[in-house]
UniProtKB/Swiss-Prot annotation:
This is Sterile alpha motif domain-containing protein 15. Residues 233-242 have a biased composition (Basic residues). PROSITE patterns: SAM_DOMAIN. PANTHER family: STERILE ALPHA MOTIF DOMAIN-CONTAINING PROTEIN 15 (PTHR46829:SF1). Gene3D superfamilies: Transcription Factor, Ets-1. The lineage of its organism: Eukaryota, Metazoa, Chordata, Craniata, Vertebrata. Residues 261-270, 609-620 have a biased composition (Acidic residues).
């Protein structure tokens, strides 16, 4: 062995330790043969080393076998490196052997996937557990599933949801649906901690009890519903029967009410006649007693007819008739038996009208209104000479019917009759009135005459309406388009100037600018044509201008202004020039201002002053 000089500096690669670093050891397990050769090729083969130094042991560049690298890992015991390769997914098995991978042994510490899988199962079971407010049927169902099966949770999931739903619905029908708030509040924390124990205890305690309670509770509402249905059916039948009986008795009641009103009106007429014509007491008493007895008998009949349907009806139907029936019953009860006990007719006259005042006030009040509205022919006095005595008797019931409709209280009519029946009643009245008073035909003939007289006026109005649109507006030219203006110019006799108007877009509103000063700008330079076109436009627009003796006229100026222009020059002529001489020389007498009124005023002033002076002299 050759000695190494003292000046020799060993490289960092030479002092490599045999123990591999942890960072590089991970690569050795999965390394290929090519990579191992590259690592060994970095060492210098020519250097001599001491056999005594462990750090100077040479690493031979020869290729090593795959089996030789395994005991290095066993001697040095690097469990962390093997743990990194094993940590794959959760539910995966041990790593499979490949041609390039080294064989490794699994330590007991590599059971971490089983721990994680157990944790995941627990979390899945906690999530799949029912909430705190689950029904008892669901708790019982899941309990039975857990007791039957020993496999994990994922396998024991029900594959037929329809069966599960049917079971849950059948069990839910047999058990009460709601819990008390106290039980739910106490059971929630227990379910989160020990769900299995809670489910077993609750099912054992509450299976027998709630079934009996629920059957009793379910029978109660069924019995109540059957009772309600049995009660409602006879009520409906009774209501229908009462309605039919009321409809049958309604026309009879109306007839009785009309009879009452007839009697009351006859009494009022007789009383008015008696007040006008006094009669002896002997004649008055029996007639009054007869009328009172008639009243009492009729009212007693009304009482019987009105009370019988009221007994049959239910309280619900009685409320629909409202107040008018109650008023009639009260009046009949008060006045039904009293007239027979009282003998004196004077006392009867005072006592009987008191309860019937409310019912008789309304029919008696509208009499003056009816007398105003009805024609003179409706009155009995006017109908006597025109018609025989037989028709006068028929006139009274028609009038009474009208008074009953107008004067009777609206509440009673609405409660006793429908709209359809009232309409039929009104139609009957109209037919009766037409039979009694055929003068209505005369009014129809008058309306026909009026229509015939109106016809010529309508014809005149139609003729006026037709003539108005034919009139042309005064300023129709304002709506003309440039093409229409060009046609108008060609009609005047200047078709060569059409393009001048169309190119300059001169419509009807711009015709006011068509004059001798603007026509040359449009391209019309002939002086005679300019004069003719400007003249026709003035006529069309209604502009009046004086005819000038020459075509181009000087601008209008004031006479005084023109005079001062001449007077402003220096010289003998300008100095001696006066306004009157200038006006005469220029021929501007027509443009002189009117001074006649001012001259008269100036002349009147001295006259007034002379008169005032004379008055002053006389006063002095």
């Amino acid at each position: 062995m050759s000695e190494v000089s003292g000046d020799y500096n060993s490289d960092s690669d030479e002092s490599l330790s045999l123990q591999p670093k942890r960072t590089k050891s991970g690569k050795l397990h999965n390394a290929n043969a090519d990579t191992l050769f590259e690592v060994s090729s970095k060492l210098s083969p020519n250097t001599d080393r001491d056999p005594g130094n462990v750090g100077n042991v040479p690493l031979e560049p020869t290729r090593t076998r795959k089996g030789d690298l395994v005991p290095v890992g066993k001697n040095h015991e690097v469990p962390d490196l093997q743990r990194q390769d094993v940590s794959v997914g959760v539910f995966k098995g041990p790593p499979t052997r490949t041609g390039t991978q080294l064989p490794t042994k699994i330590d007991p510490e590599q059971k971490t996937p089983d721990i994680r899988s157990e944790k995941l199962r627990k979390s899945v079971e906690e999530e799949a557990l029912p909430p705190s407010k689950m029904t008892k049927s669901e708790k019982k169902q899941k309990e039975s599933i857990k007791e039957k099966s020993t496999e994990p949770y994922e396998v024991t999931k029900p594959k037929f949801p329809d069966r599960k739903l049917r079971k849950s619905t059948e069990e839910a029908d047999l058990k009460p649906h709601f819990k008390s708030t106290e039980q739910s509040g106490t059971e929630q924390p227990e379910q989160t901690k020990f769900p299995d124990k809670k489910l077993r205890q609750s099912t054992k305690k509450k299976v027998s009890g709630p079934l009996e309670d629920f059957e009793e509770e379910s029978r109660r509402p069924i019995d109540e519903a059957s009772l309600e249905l049995s009660q409602k059916r006879p009520l409906k039948a009774s209501k229908k029967a009462q309605k039919s009986s009321f409809d049958e008795k309604f026309p009879e009641m109306l007839e009785q009410i009309t009879v009452e009103l007839l009697d009351d009106q006859e009494e009022t007429q007789e009383e008015s006649i008696k007040e006008k014509v006094p009669e002896p007491l002997g004649d008055r008493k029996p007639s009054a007693q007869k009328h009172k007895l008639r009243k009492s008998s009729e009212r007693s009949k009304l009482k019987d007819t009105l009370i019988e349907p009221s007994k049959d009806k239910d309280p619900g139907l009685q409320t629909q008739t409202e107040f008018p029936k109650e008023k009639l019953i009260k009046t009949t009860e008060k006045t039904g038996d009293k007239p027979q006990q009282i003998t004196d007719p004077d006392i009867q006259e005072k006592s009987q009208p008191e309860p019937t005042e409310k019912n008789l006030e309304l029919p008696n009040k509208p009499k003056p209104e009816e007398e105003r509205d009805l024609p003179k022919e409706d009155k009995p006095e006017s109908s006597k000479p025109n018609y025989p005595a037989g028709k006068d008797k028929l006139a009274l019931p028609a009038k009474i019917k009208t008074e009953f409709i107008v004067g009777s209280p609206r509440e009673s009519v609405e409660s006793f009759s429908t709209l359809y029946e009232t309409q039929e009643f009104l139609k009957d009245l109209q037919t009766d009135m037409n039979e009694l008073f055929p003068i209505v035909d005369a009014s129809e003939s008058q309306t026909e005459l009026r229509d015939s007289t109106v016809l010529p006026q309508e014809v005149e109005l139609l003729g006026r309406k037709e003539t108005k649109p034919s009139l042309t507006p005064e300023f129709e030219h304002l709506t003309w388009s440039p093409e229409r203006v060009a046609e108008w110019i060609s009609d005047l006799g200047f078709p060569q100037y059409k393009e001048c108007f169309t190119e300059n877009f001169i419509n009807g509103q711009k015709l006011i600018h068509v004059n001798c000063s603007n026509l040359p700008q449009m391209g019309i330079t002939d002086f005679e044509d300019m004069k003719a076109i400007s003249y026709h436009t003035r006529v069309l627009l209604g502009i009046e201008e004086p005819l000038f003796s020459r075509s181009i006229s000087l601008p209008y100026r004031d006479n005084k202004g023109l005079f001062f222009e001449q007077k402003g020059h220096s010289g003998v002529k300008s100095d001696s020039l006066t306004l009157a001489k200038f006006v005469e020389a220029a021929g501007l007498q027509e443009y002189n201002p009117e001074i006649k009124a001012e001259e008269k005023k100036e002349d009147a002033l001295p006259e007034n002053s002379l008169e005032e002076n004379e008055e002053l002299y006389e006063a002095t």
